[in-house]
């Protein structure tokens, strides 16, 4: 077993048992990197027999980079698993096969994930497939310095795995809404810093770059200048990306993320008016 799993947490007593159930028993080691839980997160981790480590919160990217730099991982490969995610049996078998072979040319792999929203799997809306770079050789990848929606930068070739993981935050809509309210604040701050030349992200954005760099260019250079972004996001997700085929749940999912887009717009406008973070 040559895979180490890192699970960042804070107050994840509802989600963590499901993530651990999908990770314990086959990985070389599992680390729960906690940033100050006041619920039963620690108790759940210790009962499962995994290593619980506290580290004060530094931000999404810095927290995970600290774990990669300081935790005594024994695996040659590392998988980053959020507490509200589950590694499916099919994905587990594929991860083990890659780690066992250890002769692949790739140093990192994108993993597809599917979202559960209001107890229904989202199959369209532009949220499936949803590729995340989560599996990589130890020492060959780090997260870019960014406040939110950070990407991993890999030294070497990158591949794609066939099987999926599940994303399902079981803490309910009240928490989900609060989380996205926080994310929209971070997104607005990031856009404001880019406009003012204050951004610290290590991943560049360019129309002529790779897929992520091109998407970043659209998101940071073109998208903020458009009017009615919330409307166009809803139209894109619900009509052009066939969210309508996800039924009533798809409608609510698209409308929720359109409102999230509008929150970013309002908060960025406020920052522009004040002229400071």
Annotate each language-model stretch with its function.
Residues 2-4:
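Cell-envelope/extracellular polymer assembly enzymes that use nucleotide-activated donors
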Residues 6-25:
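Short, well-formed alpha-helical segments that are part of the catalytic scaffolds
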Residues 14-18, 39-48, 90-91:
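Acidic helix N-cap motif at the loop->helix transition within catalytic regions
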Residues 22, 26, 34-43, 57, ...:
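A conserved acidic beta->alpha catalytic loop
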Residues 26, 47-49, 154:
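Short, structured coil segments at secondary-structure junctions
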Residues 29, 51, 157-159:
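Conserved beta-strand segments of alpha/beta enzyme cores
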Residues 42-70, 74, 101:
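Conserved donor nucleotide-binding strand/loop of the catalytic core
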Residues 62-68, 75, 79, 88-272:
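Catalytic-site signature of metal-activated, phosphate-bearing donor transferases
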């Amino acid at each position: 077993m040559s895979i180490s799993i890192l699970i960042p947490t804070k107050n994840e007593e509802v989600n963590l048992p499901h993530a651990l159930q999908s990770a314990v028993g086959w990985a070389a080691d599992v680390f729960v990197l906690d940033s100050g839980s006041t619920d039963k997160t620690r108790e759940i981790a210790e009962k499962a027999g995994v290593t619980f480590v506290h580290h004060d919160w530094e931000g999404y990217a810095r927290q995970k980079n600290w774990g990669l730099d300081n935790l005594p991982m024994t695996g040659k490969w590392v998988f980053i698993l959020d507490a509200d995610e589950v590694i499916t049996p099919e994905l587990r078998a594929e991860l083990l096969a890659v780690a066992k072979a250890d002769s692949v040319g790739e140093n990192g792999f994108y993993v597809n994930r599917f979202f559960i929203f209001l107890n229904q799997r989202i199959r369209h809306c532009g949220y499936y497939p949803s590729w995340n770079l989560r599996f990589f050789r130890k020492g060959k990848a780090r997260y870019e310095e960014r406040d939110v929606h950070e990407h991993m930068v890999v030294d070497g070739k990158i591949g794609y795995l066939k099987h999926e993981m599940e994303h399902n935050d079981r803490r309910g809509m009240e928490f989900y809404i609060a989380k996205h309210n926080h994310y929209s604040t971070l997104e607005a701050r990031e856009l404001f810093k880019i406009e003012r030349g204050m951004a610290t992200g290590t991943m560049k954005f360019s129309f002529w770059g790779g897929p992520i760099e091109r998407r970043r260019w659209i998101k940071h250079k073109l998208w903020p200048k458009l009017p009615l972004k919330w409307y166009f996001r809803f139209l894109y997700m619900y009509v052009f990306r066939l969210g309508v085929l996800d039924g009533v749940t798809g409608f609510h999912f698209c409308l929720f993320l359109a409102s999230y887009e509008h929150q970013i717009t309002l908060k960025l406008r406020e920052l522009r008016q004040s002229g400071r973070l």
